[in-house]
Amino acid sequence: SIRRFRSRSLLFEDMVSMGSLAPEIADFLVMAVRGRLNMLVSGGTGAGKTTLLNNLSRFIPVSERVITIEQTAELQLQQPDVVSLEMRPANGEGEGEIDQRDLLKNSLRMRPDRILVGESRGGEVLEMLQAMNTGHDGSMSTLHANDTRDALDRLEMMIALSGVDL
């Protein structure tokens, strides 16, 4: 499929004026980013998770090093010190695959201040949560889920998929 982006990004201000986002929630989210709180944005397909993540990234200080990890590049960060990493599928012989889990592990060696995972979808969520809890405060990701309970259930399932015996 082909993902088309708007010629002009949808900003928090636009979301507030359209009634999609309450002004108080927008202010809270900005303070959460500036306060380096870890965030997981959840919602259904087409709900605007990536749009919200792009908006949140606008409030990351320009002095911070940010690593983005995605299956397909969709995040459009404006900071000067951004390293964008993308998954790579296996070749015709089934070799050379680089998945999000590999990228997350390697990103930790790049000394990021924050890590943004475009979409958490499998066993890599365990590495993401460990990174969030070991000094990479302010990291963010998205997750397909219909509500808060579903998001927590999906996180639990993805951790189980990691293959790590907890």
Enumerate the language-model features and the residues they cover.
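P-loop NTP-binding catalytic core
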Residues: S1-G35
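Switch/coupling sub-region of P-loop NTPases
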Residues: A26-T45, N55-L166
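Conserved lysine of the Walker
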Residues: K49
